[in-house]
């Protein structure tokens, strides 16, 4: 595409040069050029005829496949412009689209690098935001690469539903990453100038990813429907076995996921967990900081690496990067092992970078730890824990802060028996996150503020993301309960256009306002959001006076609620057993 743009640009410069004087020599050259042009046109017509012959089927397939996307013109023109081999299937169109998207992402990466190197007068937060972009763009490249590999194996390597879930998760996360990059430039006017320089490229990639996601969703849902239709001829028993496998994943005869190593099985079966490294602030362990222990952990490991963090207060910011896979943080108990920080937006951080602990590497686990950010309500966004780790889980952990406490950024996540406390949007992000048996408490905010338990960030209707709160307790801390009439508290508000939050089988105290939910800004997203409640109890659970938005609905049956269980929403049957944590796959 770049050479084409350069050609058009040069042609436009030539055309607009009004000082051009056509001398007799120039006229002669033009005549010569016209003769050459006629010959070239004849040759090109023959070539085009060949391309048309080859691509007539491709044209029809491409047009049909792109019709399922949100941006069909972009879908068609992007792939059609590349020429290349003839397209014979929906899968080939998706692969071609993903390859083009990868090229665009690489272009954006170098654009950000150039801004960092050459733009003068950048503020510290702008530099931080640009580095956030490099991180999320790098993650996007990995996600697209894995998606293409998974597509090559489709549909034979694993079950259709597992293929579908994995592909949709990868591209959903890629879309989220583009928005995260731009969100880093939304704090003041100076930030927005840098944002403008990145906007076109980031939005282009987001739209390309959106198209790929729509095509993947269409292909996999069609294939699953066809499989189930063929499967109707099988016996009832076989049907049930197949359906069970789709929910529970590929398990061995002992009920463990097949990918789980023998060593990890022994680890999970044991009454005590053996640590590979120990952190102690008094010097009695292998390391005195958590960050040092993470740095020493192996990269891209298929084996669980357990870091025991002894009781103590660790004042540091810790990042478990994407290369640090299968890391487990094991504390001595909530309130005993505390990792604390105070980064915040008011003092110059981005929301993304403010996290005290950020877990990105796949299959991250944590138990018996307190994560906190002590910045306070006047410092605005200040994250205690940010999670972008796929197949991550947290057990008996505390997340304490004020605004934006728990950032469930992306991928599949699970929280059980955790305590989450905050004020504004204190559970937010665009992961597919399930919270079970957790205590979720709003606390007293600053004067004039309203408490919002959730702010879910789904930006595309085909993303398989959302926040599910099941069998939890939603209430307030003692300092809020004493003045609850002064500070309204709501279940959530829509951060992005297709925000999706489901609260079911939970106890909701009367700290929650009768209307339940709050708008973000005017009528934004009220028709497109998905807010659901099901079989909740408590003083704030009544739905008679809930909001009357088009996107809000009370679920009335188990069948309608089932897709939001851990078994289906995050494919928990295939991986939650490997955590060793308690969980429920169903209602």
From Swiss-Prot:
Catalytic reaction annotation: [(1->4)-alpha-D-galacturonosyl methyl ester](n) + n H2O = [(1->4)-alpha-D-galacturonosyl](n) + n methanol + n H(+)
InterPro entries listed in its UniProt record: Invertase/methylesterase_inhib, Pectin_lyas_fold, Pectin_lyase_fold/virulence, Pectinesterase_Asp_AS, Pectinesterase_cat, Pectinesterase_inhib_dom, Pectinesterase_Tyr_AS
Protein family (similarity comment): In the N-terminal section; belongs to the PMEI family. In the C-terminal section; belongs to the pectinesterase family.
GO biological process, one term: callus formation
Documented EC number(s): 3.1.1.11
Glycosylation sites: 99, 218
Protein name: Pectinesterase 2
Cited SUPFAM superfamilies: Pectin lyase-like, Plant invertase/pectin methylesterase inhibitor
Intrachain disulfide bonds: 418-438
Localization in the cell: Secreted, Cell wall
Source organism of the structure: Arabidopsis thaliana (Mouse-ear cress)
Site feature: Transition state stabilizer: 403
A Pfam family assignment: PMEI
Active-site residues from the entry: 404, 425
Lineage, broadest ranks: Eukaryota, Viridiplantae, Streptophyta, Embryophyta, Tracheophyta
Tissue expr: Expressed in flower buds.
Pathway participation: Glycan metabolism; pectin degradation; 2-dehydro-3-deoxy-D-gluconate from pectin: step 1/5
Residues binding substrate, per UniProt: 351, 381, 493, 495
Signal peptide bounds: 1-40
GO molecular function term, any single one: pectinesterase activity
Enzyme category, top tier: hydrolase
Key words of the record: Aspartyl esterase, Cell wall, Cell wall biogenesis/degradation, Disulfide bond, Glycoprotein, Hydrolase, Secreted, Signal
